[in-house]
């Protein structure tokens, strides 16, 4: 029973350090940054933007 208790304590310590370490990935500049929306028109505008950037061969679709 003593080995199981030690194993549970070690697992809890490892999990808590892993959870605390995940917050360190956030850079100060990224925290204050405004997300850039390249396609404010939604999915259809995103498709048109993709077709336009890739030199779309379908003239009616490319706008």
Swiss-Prot record:
Signal peptide residue numbers: 1-21
Q: Which Pfam families match?
A: Conotoxin
User: Among its keywords, does the record have Signal?
Assistant: yes
Residues annotated as region Disordered? 21-45
Residues bearing Cysteine amide are: 62
Q: Please list the residues that carry the modification 4-hydroxyproline.
A: 57
Keyword Electron transport listed? The answer is no
Q: List the disulfide bonds.
A: 56-62
Q: Which InterPro entries does the protein's record reference?
A: Conotoxin, Contryphan_CS
The GO molecular function terms of this record are: ion channel inhibitor activity; toxin activity
Q: Where in the cell is it found?
A: Secreted
> Looking at the record's lineage, which domain of life comes first?
Eukaryota
Compositional bias (Basic and acidic residues) at which positions?
23-39
Mention any one GO cellular component term assigned to this protein in its UniProt record.
extracellular region
Propeptide segments, given as residue ranges: 22-54
Entry keyword set: Amidation, D-amino acid, Disulfide bond, Hydroxylation, Ion channel impairing toxin, Neurotoxin, Secreted, Signal, Toxin
Task: Share any extra remarks.
Answer: Exists in two forms, due to cis-trans isomerization at 56-Cys-hydroxyPro-57. The cis conformation is the major form.
Q: What is known of its domains?
A: The cysteine framework is C-C.
Q: What does this protein do?
A: Its target is unknown, but this toxin may modulate voltage-activated calcium channels (Cav) or calcium-dependent potassium channels (KCa).
Q: Which family does it belong to?
A: Belongs to the O2 superfamily. Contryphan family.
Protein name from the UniProt record? Contryphan-Bu
Give the organism, scientific name. Conus bullatus (Bubble cone)
